[in-house]
Amino acid sequence: MKTIVKMIAAATVMGCAVSCGTPRGDEVPSDFKYLIDEFADLKIMRYRVPGWNALSLRQKEYVYHLSEAAKYGRDILWDQNCAVNLPVRHVLEDIIEKYDGDRECQEYADFLVYAKRVFFSNGIHHHYAEEKFFPDCSREYFAGLMAAVGDENAELLEAIYSPTLYRWRKTDVGDIVKGSSVNFYEGVDRKEVDDFYAAMADPNDREPVSYGLNSKLVKGDDGVIREEVYRIDGLYGAAISKIVGELELASEAAESELQKQYVKTLIDYYRSGDLRLWDKYNIEWVKDTLGTVDFINGFIEDYNDPLGRKATWEGLVNVRDEEASQRTVKLSENAQWFEDHSPVDPRFRKPVVKGISAKVIDAVTLAGDCYPATPIGINLPNADWIRREHGSKSVTIANITHAYDFAAQESPKSTLAEFAWDDDEIAMAKKYLSLTDEIHTDLHECLGHGSGQLLPGTSPNALGEFNSTLEETRADLFGLYYMADPKLVELGILPDGEAYKAMYANYIRNGLLVQFSRVELGKKNTEAHMQNRKLIAQWCYDKGLADNVIEKKVRDGKTYFVVNDYPALRELFGKLLAEIQRVKSEGDYATGKALVEKYAVNIDYNLHKEVLERYASLNLKPYGGFVNPRIEPVERNGKVVDYAISYTDGYLEQMLEYGHKYRTL
């Protein structure tokens, strides 16, 4: 599970104030720029790796090969997102590199923005809104560009410009399998998919594999439905063989025997596609709590599958931030206390919390579904039975959070000044929000996703297409409920009993207002994390109306949502958490569906229009992503003596380089 992006209010309010200071152990040049490009609704940033020079040569070698393995998975994600994505990308790369016509005209500028957007989204659909976006240059001009570089292709041009073809990457309307453009299914409808996997599942299996996680489901010409498994001699084999090659080199530089063992298990899994080996790898991986270097690499998250079953490929290589990790260690050491005092029905609590570990990390390489838009927190593994029996690992990605904050300082305006009600609310955010935002991420990932249990016989897929939204809702609510608990002050995690109010005010402000700047006017709220925030904020607003817990105010034609009663809001968070946990534990699909459809999806048109107009006046970009640092071996007399890190790559430069160097499909 991921906290996908830094929450928009926290990501942009820090243009007013930031409390995080200079990244640890990193001499940042005075002319260093975190923000390096802006276009459409996107901003591109750099992040730094402050602990790089403290790593040993062996650790750097381990990181280098893990990073190469991660980058070689890039083409897999592009193809998973939509079957035409790779052909489109190859044409865009050809035009940018080979076109010798006029590059100063407006239509070429429009083409270039489109290309950058496709690179950012790993395809032709918006990375958050799921809908296909289009070039602003004319179809005729685009066709001319293709012809100029020898890439004439009428079918591909139609795929780019048709308003109906490949309209949605993932849809929630009609037959959500046939109506989605993701490349997980071919020739099958939803019922056929459900029936296929229902026949596989054993409801009495207490340790089930994640059926369908690493495969494409295809109906052949003979009418037989089969899985095409992602493995070295199967689907995506060319990319997987490159990943395996780098993992083999990485294992030779691993920090410990345990790391060598689970890297070997991961390689065995990639060779066979056997999901039992994937589970074995996760069990071994979750035991590694002492290493400085860590990584994820594989088919992990199912957010992009309309049925919440099949996983996209992703990679992340990271190093531990020892000092900041002390905060998360306190949380994990007290996980049983938090579980025991949760406001949910005791039947749905874990009687014994096992193996929860947490740390703060610095990303070194982002890849696949973590690149260029990246999560700021991760909790894995996802299998409920592994979490129950073996525990989980949670991370908060500090240098990504800090990069967001420092990039925001480079902008003169902020959402906080525009959407907060008064100076007191602004002052509270400036004092506490940078800290409370990080702590909420810790609570969400470390404890929220790891909390609770399914009742015996409840399928982990029981909530179907609503599972991702409801799971993120559950984890957010767990964090929100405990933000106000005196236990956090007692543990020294929060400075005082007032700090949580900054998080509460920000969450409501974002969930009911600011986040809609990311949605095109008149469209529905479709992304799981945005849905979860709206569900929570809207439910609490509605349920607290009689007591004026959250008040809608209008001043000078502008709308604000103000928290009047913070303790009462905490009670509402607790009540909703109890209900969401019940829904998950019992697999109550009907209630989960009703909650999402009533509170999470629809946006009031007039309010939406107002938010977009106010946000536009700030000249800010609602979405952010990153370029990776460059890591290169340093040789002396034919021997590698170091691995140097640099932060010089531009956005297009890196995208084009990756398109050549790591092209496998």
Predicted regions and their residues:
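C-terminal motif of bacterial Sec signal peptides marking the signal peptidase cleavage site
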Residues: 15-19
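N-terminal-proximal low-complexity accessory segments that begin disordered
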Residues: 25-91
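An active-site-proximal "capping" alpha-helix that borders the catalytic cofactor pocket
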Residues: 56, 256, 468-485
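Long, well-structured alpha-helical subdomains associated
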Residues: 77, 480-583
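Contiguous, non-catalytic segments that form substrate-binding/exosite surfaces or channel walls
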Residues: 113-219, 227-425, 433
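Catalytic Zn2+-binding segment of zinc metalloproteases
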Residues: 446-458, 482, 486
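Post-HEXXH active-site segment of zinc metalloproteases
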Residues: 452-473
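Extended, compositionally biased alpha-helical segments that mediate assembly or anchoring
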Residues: 564-565, 569-665
